[in-house]
Amino acid sequence: MIAGGTGGANTVTGKWFEVKTDLKTALTKAGYDLTNFQFCRQYDFPSLFKTKTGEKMEDLFGKKFLPDEAVIFNNTLYVIEKKQQGGGGSVDEKIQTGPYKLAIYQECAKRMGLANAYYLYLLSGDYFNVPKFTKHQIPYLEQFGIRTYFDQLNLAEIF
């Protein structure tokens, strides 16, 4: 992100994409009972991790990890990173970090007493659903079990 908050989710389109793709709203509209879902976003996740483990993320991993959305359901941690892009930029390379972040969140899940962790990307289709990504980067992510979705999650497939 650029100093002063002009990149990432601080852009108008980035914030709009995050609101448009809100997980809790999508689950509610799809008729899911949210009783057994525990939701958190960005800065809430390190606090949840510390509450469940007594450990600070930055002490274990050198920094806090701030997922766009995370949910615990059925003894599993689901981390959803959302990327919206209107033109070329650093987000092109950010999705390549998925395998590293998956390993971090799997360790978080283990320490939180959860059975597993999944790392998912929710990408804006108008930018990412093109051969540049679908022929190279997305198959690479899939090798690690990282699922990618365009514009909306397939809730039935995930939950």
Question: What would you call each of these model-derived segments?
Answer:
Residues 38, 124-125, 151-154:
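Acidic carboxylate-rich catalytic motifs and surrounding loops in phosphoryl-/glycosyl-chemistry enzymes
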Residues 33-42, 92-100:
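Conserved long hydrophobic alpha-helices within structured protein cores
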